[in-house]
Every structure is written in structure tokens, then in C-alpha cells.
Regions:
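N-terminal secretory signal peptides that target proteins for export/translocation
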Residues: 1-2
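Bacterial N-terminal signal peptides
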Residues: 7-19
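Bacterial Sec-dependent signal peptides at the C-terminal "C-region" and cleavage site
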Residues: 16-36
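Cyclophilin-like peptidyl-prolyl cis-trans isomerases
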Residues: 21-24, 383, 387-391, 398-633
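Amphipathic alpha-helical scaffolding segments comprising HEAT/armadillo-like alpha-solenoid repeats
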Residues: 24-28, 50-63, 82-94, 113-126, ...
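Structural detector for internal amphipathic alpha-helices that build alpha-solenoid repeat scaffolds
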Residues: 31-52, 60, 68-82, 87-91, ...
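Acidic carboxylate motifs that coordinate Ca2+ or other divalent cations, activating on Asp/Glu
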Residues: 97, 195, 293
Length: 633
């Protein structure tokens, strides 16, 4: 017998955020009721079994007498993503306690086994609790089957659940590539729904890569919907991405309009991706260099790079670089473009103006010099290898060594490189790279006694010691210290002072205890201080936390488990970066600019921006964390 439905639509924002949450400056907690984890030994045991990936031990707790334990065990199994746990989880969809049913639905969705489709659909038809229903709807979106699309399209939902339906169908088609005409037609029709939250949820499908082939032949309806939108409508950000992927000349004017006039910076940045710098859109891209949003400017500069620009634009690019000495990410793109245009003197003058010890500027300088051949660039790389900054000197010496690997076929270059390596051999920060260069067979006949250098002072740079064994930063990375977490509390904050301002992150201890412990420990020990945002993709995310190499390639010597949580990847959510698979997280994390549903099954969401989202929207590559402070809460 069908149960009467209870609850309020507010749970949808917590579960999906598929509506007005998109533009919110901060988010509520995940919506999962507190279960007293930090003071409950039985619940802590479940978490520890999860970290050990003891599937049998966790499954056994699904039969526990206490509903809190059953629920915690169900949620923990989500991070295993093990299909063999589906048989044990499915009966919990009919548990007497709503929290257990909710966490079981969440886990089945994150596991994503298509065999769960029928059970989820049947549970949705009978479920009364609003929170459980929202998780059932979301879980169906991860089933990657046409049957899941059929169930979502035919489900008898309340009006306030329509955004959840559109969101899950968008995920089915856009993330998993489920080809279903009914799904496509529903989402196209819903693009012009009067409710902006439903419109936004449906539009996300058209911005996801896997969905393009399903709707490309019906693009006329997408264009009509976009043309009907107000310039402030956030749904446009997804449609302009989809149309940009089609690369159809019919859309060039349309994309130019949104790139120049959209009120949401994310829409303007997305529209830039579809503009061709070889055509009439070049003026739109050039004009965007004056956009008030730094990330729109960055997107425009990236679009300009590589284009055959007219030489008349050179003075404009020069003026921009000169007038924005601290906008290094954009300057990097424009300097690369100038190098490609053979404006060598301009680029070298910028490099020559780099002050000794300016690590951030040298990062750009060394990259830009890679586009310039010959002695002029090599002499400047050698200068960087003698910089007071150990990090700059070590990196420059490695850059010089890599250049040698590419130039060694040219006999004319041998004398130059030999002299450069010989000059650097006595500098302990550059001596490893210099020695490797001098040991090249091309220099075997030269009179130079490398053996005599054995008594040279021991090198101290990162480049020298990185091959030596060292203790991991967190030797007990897979062990939870519950006393430490109780000291942090259920809602601690991580306050990031950045080069653009203050960002405060609220952390979700109860759902991602190991992750919160890891990040808090690293912050308390000062490891995040001075670390740059090495990767920023406009309207996707800003990533930081490489405490070793600072460029995204560093590995701190430990990994931690993935902890999938019920916090959705909406704008302002903080997630752990990984090495491309579950259970490979370490120190790096990212903050999202907008909804990113494709991250749900592979990344730990462990906090959100409680204040300072306006600062996050200013962050560019090479901006940095000046300090990171943990505040218990």
C-alpha cells in the first residue's frame, strides 16, 4: 500500500542543489542527521572497518540492532563501490528507520550496479519520507541503464521533486551516456520550464560531454531555448558549453553575445570556449581582457593563445601585461602568444624584469622561455638556476637539462651547453642536473674532471634529495585519532588566507573523518602555507594542496581512503583530488565553481565554502595560500 508522502522540498537543495543552490554563496551541511560518531565507539568501529576495506565486517553491521549502526554501515559501503554488497544493502530499502533507508539508497547509487535499478524503482513507488525519496531519485541517475530512465520518466513525483527528476536524467544521459529518446525529449522540453530550478537541472545535461551525441541533431531546440533566456539565467552556462562543442558556425554570433553580455561570469567564461581566435570572434576575446572577472579574462587569454593574431594586437597585449604585474596566469598565456608571434624582445624583456627570489614569476618565465630557441633563452634559464630561491634554482637546472635532451643532436649547441653546465656544477642546488649534463657522451672527449667534484659541498635543493628515502609526512595516515577529531569537533573550519583574500571552509567531520583529520593535520603543521593554486579551470574548480612539488605532480608519501559523502558537488564544495582512482587521495584538494555531478562517485566531498566564495571566484593559477588555520567547531 502506498504510504502518504511527508517532508519538505528543502531536502532537495541539500541532496541535489539542482536549483537555486547553484548560485548560493555557501551551502548547508549534507543533510545527513548527526549520529554522534565522535562519541560512539560502535560507530567508530564501523568507520575503521571501512578504512580497512573490511567488507565482511561492515556488511555484518548492516544487521546491527541499533539503526544508527545499520545506517552508518550502509553509508560506509558506498566508498567500497563493491557490487557484492548490493545483495546485503537492498533489503535495507525497506528498513523501519528512514535514516537506514536513506543511507542504503545513497550507497546503492554510489555503487552504481545496474542490478539495483528495479529495487530502487520499487522503493521509490512506496517511499513516504522526503529525504529518502530524494536519495532514491538520485540513485536511479547513477544506474546507467535505459530502464532507470524509464523509471524516472514514469515516476509519480510531487511538483517539488521535478528538479530532482531532471537532475538525475541529466546525469544518466550526460555522465553515463545513456541513449534514450524519452530522456532527451524530456530534457529539451524542460529547458523552457517556468521554474528556474527545474530549468537549471535540465540544462546541465547539455553541458556534459557524454550527452552531446544524443541531442546534436536536435540542436535547433537548444538554440531556441538559449535565445529565450534572460542574460542572467544560470541555465545558459550549460547550453553555451554544449553548443561550443558542436563547433557550428551558426552559433558563433550567439556565443559571442553570451560571452560579452551574460551577467554570470561562469556563463561568459563558458562561452569563451566556443570562440575561434582565427575569426571575427577575436575582437570579443580581446575585449574580454577587460572583463571584471579574472577567470573570464583567463578564459579569454587561453582562447587567444595559439591563434594567428594580427600584429596590430601586439601593443594591446603588451599594455595588458605591463598594467597587470600580479596577474601571472593571464600574463603567461599572453606571453606564450607573443612568443609564437615571434615578439621575442617583448618576452625577454618581461623575463629580465623578474626580481631575484620571485618564485611565482619565475614559474611563468621558465615556461615561456621554452617557446624561444637559442642562446638568449638558455642564458636566462641559467640565470634562474643561480637565483636565490632554492626552488627556482632547482627547477631551472632541470629545465636546462631537459632543453639539452632536445638540443643535443645539434653539434653547434654543444659548446654552449657545456659551458652552462660547467658554470653550474659548483652550485649545490643545480649540481645534480649539471653533473648529468656533463656526463653526456657528447662531452666525453672534453677535459673536465668530474671525479674531482666528489668533495664538493653536499647539495641541499629539493632536486638533489628527492631520490633519497624520507619519512612520510603522515606515517599513520590510515589511522583515525578519535581524540584529535573530538578536539576539532563536528564542524571545524579551515581558514585560508590567500593572495586574493580570505576563504573559510567548513569541514564535514562526521562524514569524512579521515579526510578532515588529514587536511587538519597538514594545516596545523604549516604544510599548506605558501602552496599555490596550481590548477584553475574557469567554471570548474580551483585546485591546490601540492605540498611537495607545488605544481600538481608532487606525492607526499602517503595516501588515504576515499570517503564518499552525501554532500553534493555544488558551487563552493571542497573535494579531495586523487590520482585517478579511489583510495589514492593525499594532500591536494579543490573548490568547485559550479555543479559538477560527474564527480559524485569518485571524489570525497568533505566541506564547503562558508564565507569567501567571492574570493574563490577571483583565484587564478599561481595565486597561493598564504596561511591555513584550523578553527575547532
Amino acid at each position: 500500500m502506498r504510504r502518504p508522502r511527508l517532508g519538505l522540498a528543502v531536502v532537495l537543495c541539500a541532496t541535489f542543489g539542482a536549483a537555486g543552490c547553484e548560485a548560493a554563496p555557501s551551502l548547508p551541511s549534507s543533510g545527513r542527521p548527526a549520529d554522534g560518531l565522535l562519541d560512539d565507539a560502535e560507530l567508530q568501529t564501523v568507520v575503521e572497518l571501512g578504512i580497512q576495506r573490511d567488507i565482511d565486517g561492515v556488511v555484518e553491521r548492516l544487521l546491527a540492532e541499533r539503526p544508527e549502526v545499520r545506517a552508518r554501515a550502509a553509508m560506509t559501503l558506498a566508498s567500497f563501490q563493491a557490487a557484492e554488497s548490493v545483495v546485503a544493502l537492498s533489503p535495507l530499502l525497506d528498513d523501519a528507520e528512514a535514516q537506514v533507508r536513506r543511507d542504503a539508497a545513497f550507497a546503492l547509487g554510489r555503487i552504481g550496479d545496474p542490478g539495483s535499478t528495479g529495487a530502487l524503482g520499487a522503493a521509490l513507488a512506496e517511499e513516504a519520507d522526503a529525504g529518502v525519496r530524494s536519495h532514491l531519485i538520485e540513485a536511479l541517475g547513477h544506474m546507467a541503464t535505459e530502464r532507470a530512465a524509464d523509471l524516472l520518466l514514469s515516476a509519480d513525483l510531487e511538483s517539488w521533486e521535478e528538479a530532482a527528476r531532471a537532475s538525475s536524467l541529466s546525469v544518466l544521459g550526460g555522465v553515463y551516456g545513456v541513449s534514450h529518446e524519452g530522456l532527451r525529449d524530456y530534457l529539451i522540453e524542460t529547458l523552457t520550464h517556468e521554474d528556474p530550478s527545474i530549468r537549471l537541472a535540465a540544462s546541465s545535461f547539455f553541458g556534459l560531454q557524454s550527452g552531446v551525441r544524443l541531442w546534436a541533431r536536435h540542436a535547433i531546440y537548444v538554440r531556441q531555448a538559449l535565445d529565450s533566456y534572460d542574460l542572467a539565467d544560470p541555465a545558459a552556462m550549460h547550453l553555451v558549453v554544449g553548443l561550443a562543442r558542436l563547433d557550428d558556425f551558426l552559433d558563433y554570433g550567439r556565443l559571442s553575445r553570451w560571452a560579452a553580455q551574460a551577467q554570470d561570469w561562469r556563463t561568459r567564461a563558458n562561452a569563451m570556449s566556443g570562440l575561434n581566435p582565427l575569426g571575427s570572434a577575436v575582437q570579443v576575446l580581446v575585449d574580454a581582457l577587460a572583463d571584471p572577472s579574472p577567470l573570464v579574462v583567463f578564459a579569454a587569454a587561453r582562447a587567444l593563445t595559439g591563434g594567428a593574431l594580427d600584429d596590430s594586437l601586439v601593443p594591446l597585449l603588451e599594455r595588458w601585461i605591463e598594467g597587470h604585474p600580479n596577474r601571472l596566469a593571464v600574463s603567461r598565456e599572453l606571453l606564450i602568444q607573443l612568443a609564437l608571434m615571434r615578439q621575442i624582445d617583448v618576452v625577454l624583456a618581461w623575463v629580465d624584469a623578474t626580481a631575484p627570489g620571485d618564485e611565482r614569476r619565475w614559474v611563468v618565465g621558465l615556461e615561456v622561455l621554452s617557446y624561444i630557441p637559442g642562446q638568449e633563452s638558455l642564458s636566462r634559464i641559467a640565470r634562474a638556476a643561480r637565483d636565490p630561491s632554492e626552488r627556482t634554482a632547482a627547477e631551472a637546472s632541470l629545465v636546462l637539462l631537459r632543453r639539452w635532451q632536445g638540443d643535443r643532436q645539434s653539434a653547434e649547441a654543444h659548446d654552449l651547453y657545456f659551458d652552462l653546465f660547467r658554470e653550474l656544477i659548483d652550485d649545490p642546488r643545480a649540481s645534480v642536473a649539471a653533473r648529468q649534463g656533463l656526463e653526456s657522451p657528447e662531452f666525453a672527449v672534453r677535459s673536465f674532471d668530474l671525479a674531482a667534484l666528489g668533495a664538493t659541498s653536499a647539495p641541499t635543493s629539493e632536486a638533489q634529495v628527492k631520490d633519497e628515502p624520507s619519512l612520510p609526512l603522515l606515517p599513520d595516515a590510515q589511522t583515525i585519532d578519535w581524540g584529535f577529531l573530538r578536539g576539532l569537533g563536528n564542524a571545524p573550519s579551515l581558514v585560508l588566507e590567500t593572495t586574493r583574500g580570505t576563504v573559510t571552509l567548513q569541514l564535514l567531520t562526521a562524514e569524512a573523518p579521515l579526510t578532515v583529520q588529514t587536511v587538519a593535520r597538514l594545516a596545523l603543521d604549516g604544510h599548506y602555507d605558501g602552496v599555490p593554486f596550481h590548477r584553475v579551470l574557469p567554471n570548474f574548480m580551483a585546485q591546490t594542496g601540492d605540498i611537495v612539488a607545488r605544481d600538481g605532480t608532487g606525492e607526499p608519501g602517503f595516501t588515504i581512503r576515499t570517503e564518499l559523502t552525501q554532500l553534493p558537488f555544488e558551487a563552493g564544495v571542497v573535494g579531495m583530488a586523487n590520482l585517478g582512482s579511489l583510495d589514492s587521495e593525499n594532500s591536494q584538494f579543490f573548490i568547485t565553481h559550479s555543479r559538477q555531478p560527474h564527480l559524485a562517485r569518485g571524489f570525497t566531498a568533505f566541506g564547503w565554502v562558508s564565507s569567501g566564495m567571492d574570493v574563490v571566484d577571483l583565484l587564478e593559477p599561481l595565486d597561493a595560500i598564504l596561511s591555513a588555520t584550523v578553527v575547532p567547531g
